[in-house]
Amino acid sequence: MSRKLCTLNFTLSGKQGSLVIRDIQLWSNRPTASKSTSELRGQFIQYVDLAKLPLWVRSTNMNTYRCYSTSATAQAYFKSKLRNANRGIVIELSDKVDQRSQEPAYLIIFRENTELNCFQVDLTMKHEFDGQVTKLKQEIGKTRASVSKEGSIDIIIQQSQQRKIGTKTKVYRNVHINDKRLQFNETLSKLILGGLRLRGISNSITDYQKLYKITFDAAEFTHRDELKRISMGSVEEVSFESLQETVETLLKLFTKS
């Protein structure tokens, strides 16, 4: 039997100020010890691609909660932002912490078919990884401290291995940068083509290619600062919403009769 666990309200911060998404009810099919319902407060962090989340984010025995809301604002928000089935919304809970690390706790809200669900990010495996890495670093430090002149060949081998790792890291970094730029180009192209179709502009129309190209070039110029930072290895990405807004603005300008 389903039981209401709590109600979640979280804040969206934007250029026009803050908007609070209210009355998100979390329900569970699993029995719980507590009979009362609580109210959680949170802050929107970012959107994520569920298919690209690390394996440690979700454990096999974790709870998934069903989400409901009677708020028209909340319903419209989720309908707009979760059109893509792989997209998730990350919420940092303001008044709840991870029991092991005492770090903030996080919820990820997502859509599964027509249902709205969420789960709490499981940090247990991450902490285990962090502990193993710390232990390994300590062991390496002790080994280096005990190396004598007779062990100089080991140092040479280790330095050679580190150089190889550094080269691989650099190659990986370049591949990652290229992937981000390719993703930007693909998303931008799809948005432009979709915008042209919505306006009834067929590729058989004269200057179709010219209109596509000037829109593409203008969008690149608009986001030149973000693209420059990406080319320098930044982890940030040009958000889908920002790129969509840019394309819509440009097409309105270029197709104005």
From Swiss-Prot:
* One GO process term, biological-process aspect: regulation of DNA-templated DNA replication initiation
Subcellular location(s) per record: Nucleus; Cytoplasm, Cytoskeleton, Spindle pole
In terms of InterPro entries, this protein maps to: Sld7, Sld7_C, Sld7_N
Tree of life domain: Eukaryota
Q: Which residues form the signal peptide?
A: none
UniProt keyword Disulfide bond, yes or no: no
Gene Ontology CC entries for this record: cytoplasm; nucleus; spindle pole
One Pfam family name is Sld7_C
Main localization, broad class? nucleus
Alphabetically ordered keywords of this record: Cell cycle, Cytoplasm, Cytoskeleton, DNA replication, Nucleus
Q: What does this protein do?
A: Required for the proper function of SLD3 at the initiation of DNA replication. Binds to SLD3 and reduces its affinity for CDC45, a component of the replication fork. Required for mitochondrial morphology.
> Which family does the UniProt entry place this protein in?
Belongs to the SLD7 family.
Q: How does it assemble?
A: Interacts with SLD3.
What is the protein name given in its UniProt record?
Mitochondrial morphogenesis protein SLD7
Report the source organism. Saccharomyces cerevisiae (strain VIN 13) (Baker's yeast)
Question: Coding gene?
Answer: SLD7
